[in-house]
Structures are given as structure tokens and as C-alpha cells.
Design a protein with these regions (language model features):
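Conserved alpha-helix/loop element of class I SAM-dependent methyltransferases that forms part
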Residues: 2-20
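Conserved SAM-binding loop
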Residues: 20-106
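S-adenosyl-L-methionine-dependent methyltransferase catalytic module, highlighting the catalytic core
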Residues: 79-83, 87-199
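A broad, low-specificity signal for short, low-complexity segments enriched in glycine/proline
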Residues: 9-10, 27-28, 111, 124
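Hydrophobic, well-ordered secondary-structure scaffolds
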Residues: 8-9, 68, 131-132
Length: 199
């Protein structure tokens, strides 16, 4: 199995992933150079015209090794978020990488665009990571967080890996790792530095 390194500029971080195919979902006219670009609009650089809120996507299960969601999730209708993330999971191969960048949910960058309807903050990705109280609400397909960064006046970026069902022993370990994550930050405010160092 051949692998390559992918540099995520927003995080100044390198990830090891399998070679292509890689998907740039909602690429607009700014498709990543090494990706297959998908968008609901026919723009320069778009390889496949498809509305990604229309699920399923025209791809086989586990047909790509990486998905980029660069400033797309904030445009996805909130009630479709779980189905959308589950579709990303379906299309990615096991241990595939999902990189999601979005304006921080309470920032001017989020609210300035009249089409932004789905705000994400630093706790939102944990709804997709087994082993914490937020995941237990909807129990979607399972991911693990490899990197999480954010600035409250800028963007949030998260790199997630597709995982399969975890064992009860592993879930206990994960729950211990994420024990500080609570719905609505009931106990203490989220600390930006803490969130950066533990993933």
C-alpha cells in the first residue's frame, strides 16, 4: 500500500494518507490541485456536478482516501448534518482522512455570509467521536479526531479519521481521554490551549 503526506496549511501539519483518489467536496472554483472536485454549480475546475445534500453521492463505498470540506459545512442544512457526515464516512475507506475547515460558529466570518446556516464550534466535532457524552445523543458513524484548531475570531479546522466500531475496552479509554467534553460546556468554559494540545 503506497502512502503520501498531505500538508494542511491551516494547521501547519502533515498527515499520512493513502494515494488518491481524494475528493474536494463543495470545491467551487478553488479546487485542491490533486483532488476530484464536486460542486452543485458548474464552475471552472469542477469535475462532477452534484448537490451534496442529495444523498447518496454517486460514489461507491470506501472509494476515496481523503475528503476536503473547505468552507462547506456551514452551508449544509443543520438537519442534514448527521446524514452528510455519515455519507462522508461511507465514501471514505477505513482510516481515511476528513479535513473540515469552517468559520468559527460565533465569529463575524460566520455571520457575514447570508447563506451560512450551520455554525460549528470546538465541541461540535465531538458529536461524531465515540466515548463522550455528545456522541451518545445521536450515535452517528464513528470518527476520531487527529487535529483540532480554532480561533474565535477566525476559522475552526478539524482533521478526523474514519474508524469502525470500537470495542468496549477502547471506548472506555476514549471516554477517559475526552472526559472534559460536556454538552454546552456546563462545567467550565472551553479552553483553547487545552483543546489544542490533547488531540
Amino acid at each position: 500500500m503506497k502512502e503520501t503526506k498531505f500538508h494542511w496549511k491551516e494547521a501547519d501539519h502533515w498527515f499520512t494518507i493513502k494515494l488518491q483518489p481524494w475528493l474536494d467536496v463543495g470545491c467551487g472554483n478553488n479546487k485542491h490541485i490533486d483532488c476530484l472536485g464536486i460542486d452543485k454549480r458548474q464552475l471552472e475546475g469542477v469535475d462532477l456536478v452534484h448537490d451534496v445534500e442529495n444523498i447518496p453521492w454517486p460514489f461507491k463505498d470506501e472509494s476515496c482516501s481523503m475528503i476536503l470540506l473547505n468552507h462547506l459545512i456551514e452551508h449544509i442544512k443543520p438537519w442534514l448534518t448527521i446524514d452528510f457526515m455519515n455519507e462522508c464516512w461511507r465514501v471514505l475507506e477505513f482510516n481515511g482522512l476528513l479535513i473540515l475547515v469552517t468559520p468559527y460558529g460565533f465569529s463575524l466570518r460566520h455571520f457575514q455570509d447570508p447563506t451560512h446556516c450551520n455554525p460549528w464550534v470546538e465541541s461540535t466535532p465531538f458529536y461524531f467521536v465515540p466515548g463522550n457524552n455528545l456522541y451518545d445523543i445521536y450515535k452517528p458513524k464513528q470518527w476520531t479526531i487527529e487535529k483540532l484548531i480554532y480561533a474565535v475570531d477566525g476559522d475552526l479546522g478539524v482533521a478526523m479519521r474514519k474508524i469502525e466500531d470500537i470495542s468496549p475496552e477502547t471506548e472506555k479509554e476514549v471516554r477517559n481521554k475526552w472526559k472534559h467534553v460536556y454538552m454546552g460546556a456546563k462545567k467550565t468554559p472551553y479552553n483553547r490551549e487545552i483543546m489544542k494540545v490533547h488531540v
